[in-house]
Amino acid sequence: SEFFGRLRDVLGTQEGVRIVGDRFIFSSEVLFEPAQAELAEEGQAELTKVVDILRNVANDIPEGIDWVLQVDGHTDNVPIRNSPNFANNWELSQARALSVVLYMVEQLGMPPDRLSANGFGEFQPVAVGDSDDARAQNRRIELKFTEK
């Protein structure tokens, strides 16, 4: 689609950021420090690039279509241990998705009624296995336009 074509042009071959089908996927390493939900500076910069394009795309969506940008957080399958902030990967993935949504609303001016934050923990992997590479692929934030 034109939307994903524009995203590819802006982001080029940025490491840790890719487009797969109808989803825009950030590696968690680009956005967050390990086991943290606060956006890193690099993550803020990448989100700002994407939101600039999202605004243009949103303006092109016909008025009768009630859309939302889904922000989905995913983790690897390594259990969280001894974290004062998160009891498990469900909580970490939800907190990361919410951190992205709040940044988009509070810092970038996205309308809050057009965003949703969802956490899936380790239960929707894109790579199978326990290798470092598989786990890295599964630690991600996905953005997807969908109808409400």
Map each language-model feature to its residues:
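Periplasmic OmpA-like peptidoglycan-binding domain that tethers envelope proteins to the cell wall
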Residues: 1, 31-54, 58, 67-148
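Phosphate-binding glycine-rich loops and adjacent basic patches that engage nucleotide phosphates
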Residues: 7-18, 59-68, 104
